[in-house]
C-alpha cells in the first residue's frame, strides 16, 4: 500500500504551498503507479486506487486515461471541479473569476500567493456555534482533535480555484470501463450527490455502496463505519 500527500500539501514538496491543481493532482496518481510498478514485489496487473473526498475525484480522473489503474474505489467522493461552482449562477461565476484574476496581480506584486486557511492553527475544544452545514461538519473533523493537523488547515491558495473552474475532472468517466469502480458513500453525507452523479455517468462494471448512519467525514476515520470488508472483497475479486 502506498499513501502520499498531494504535491503542495501536507509534508509533500512544492512551491507555493497549498496550491491546488487538477492536472498535477491527477498526474500524482499516475506517478504513484509508476513508483509501485518499479517495486519487485508489485504485480503491475493488480494496481488499484482508493481515493477519499477530493482524492476520490482525482483517482477517477487519473483512471480515465491511465489504464494501469485496474480498479478504483472512492469514499465520500468530491468532484472538486464541480464543487467550486456550486451555488453560483453565471453572473456570480464571472464575478468570482474577476476577483480571483485581480488577486493574481496582487500575488505577483507580493511575490507569494494569498492563502487564507479555513481552520485554526491550534485544535479547538468545541465546534463554534452558528456554523452552517457543511462548514460545521468540516469543523467537526479538521478543527478539533479528531482530525486537526498543523499541515491540514484547509483551503487552497485563493487563485487555485481558477484552475478547478476551468478543467472538469470527470468528463470521460465512462471510459474507465471495463475496469470496475466502487463508490462508497454515507447515507447522511452532504456530498452524496457527487457519488450518485458519477455512478450514473460511469459505465459498467460499477457499484454504489451506501453506508448506514454515516455522514461525509465518518468515512475518513470511523472504523465502525468504513466498510473494510467490502473494500477488501472488491479489490480481491476485481483485480
Predicted regions and their residues:
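Short beta-to-alpha linker loops that shape the active-site pocket of alpha/beta-hydrolase fold enzymes
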Residues: 5-10, 78, 212-215
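Catalytic nucleophile-loop/oxyanion-hole region of alpha/beta-hydrolase
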Residues: 9-45, 221, 225-227
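Short glycine-enriched nucleophile-adjacent loop
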Residues: 36, 56-67, 198
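Alpha/beta-hydrolase-fold enzymes
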Residues: 60-140
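Active-site nucleophile elbow and catalytic-triad environment of alpha/beta-hydrolase enzymes
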Residues: 87-88, 155-173, 190
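Short beta-strand/loop motif that positions the catalytic acidic residue
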Residues: 176-177, 182-185
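Conserved loop-alpha-helix segment in the C-terminal half of the alpha/beta-hydrolase fold
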Residues: 187-206
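Catalytic active-site module of serine/aspartate enzymes centered on a nucleophile-bearing elbow/loop
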Residues: 212-239
Amino acid at each position: 500500500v502506498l499513501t502520499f500527500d498531494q504535491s503542495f500539501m501536507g509534508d509533500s514538496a512544492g512551491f507555493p504551498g497549498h496550491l491546488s491543481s487538477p492536472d498535477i493532482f491527477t498526474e500524482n496518481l499516475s506517478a504513484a503507479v509508476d513508483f509501485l510498478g518499479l517495486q519487485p514485489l508489485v504485480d503491475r496487473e493488480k494496481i488499484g486506487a482508493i481515493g477519499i473526498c477530493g482524492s476520490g475525484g482525482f483517482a477517477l480522473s487519473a483512471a480515465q486515461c491511465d489504464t494501469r489503474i485496474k480498479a478504483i474505489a472512492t469514499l465520500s467522493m468530491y468532484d472538486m471541479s464541480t464543487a467550486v461552482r456550486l451555488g453560483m449562477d453565471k453572473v456570480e461565476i464571472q464575478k468570482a473569476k474577476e476577483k480571483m484574476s485581480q488577486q493574481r496581480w496582487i500575488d505577483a506584486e507580493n511575490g507569494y500567493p494569498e492563502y487564507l486557511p479555513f481552520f485554526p492553527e491550534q485544535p479547538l475544544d468545541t465546534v463554534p456555534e452558528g456554523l452552517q452545514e457543511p462548514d460545521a461538519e468540516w469543523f467537526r473533523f479538521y478543527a478539533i482533535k479528531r482530525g486537526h493537523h498543523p499541515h491540514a488547515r484547509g483551503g487552497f491558495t485563493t487563485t487555485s480555484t481558477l484552475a478547478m473552474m476551468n478543467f472538469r475532472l470527470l468528463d470521460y468517466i465512462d471510459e474507465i470501463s471495463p475496469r470496475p469502480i466502487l463508490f462508497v458513500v454515507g447515507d447522511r453525507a452532504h456530498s452524496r450527490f457527487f457519488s450518485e452523479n458519477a455512478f450514473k455517468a460511469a459505465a459498467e462494471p460499477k457499484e454504489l455502496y451506501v453506508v448506514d448512519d454515516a455522514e461525509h467525514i465518518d468515512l475518513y476515520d470511523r472504523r465502525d463505519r468504513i466498510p473494510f470488508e467490502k473494500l477488501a472483497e472488491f479489490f480481491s475479486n476485481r483485480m
